């Protein structure tokens, strides 16, 4: 059975993602790592901090030690730290908004971004 570790910055989308995994990827074991202090720290500091990067790297290492096949970064606001985590793990890491951004670039030249949290805008636009 394949395993995916999801790094969350809030429990808000946990149940929805669990339901999607169960429906679309029933053969994949979903492991959840939740640190709701990450998003608050991003908001307070208008971006990622060394502490966020450090914790994200620890979570990436923990996920890898669990033998996951993929790490999914669920929060765009910490996307820049996920880029650093990618350099510290051997398993693939996917930012949740990467496939959407890649598809948007293929479809058009003017791309609008709508976000539920202001701290998402910069990392999402930088994709």
Go through the PLM ranges and name each one:
Residues 1-127:
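Non-catalytic structural scaffold of enzyme domains
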């Amino acid at each position: 059975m394949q395993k995916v570790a999801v790094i969350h910055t809030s429990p808000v989308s946990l149940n929805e993602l669990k339901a999607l995994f169960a429906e679309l990827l029933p053969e994949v074991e979903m492991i959840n790592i939740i640190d709701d202090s990450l998003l608050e720290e991003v908001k307070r500091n208008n971006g990622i901090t060394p502490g966020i990067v450090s914790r994200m790297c620890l979570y990436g290492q923990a996920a890898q030690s669990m033998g996951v096949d993929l790490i999914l970064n669920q929060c765009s606001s910490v996307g820049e730290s996920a880029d650093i985590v990618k350099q510290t793990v051997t398993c693939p890491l996917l930012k949740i908004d990467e496939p959407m951004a890649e598809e948007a670039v293929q479809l058009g030249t003017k791309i609008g971004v709508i976000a539920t949290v202001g701290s998402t805008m910069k990392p999402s636009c930088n994709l």
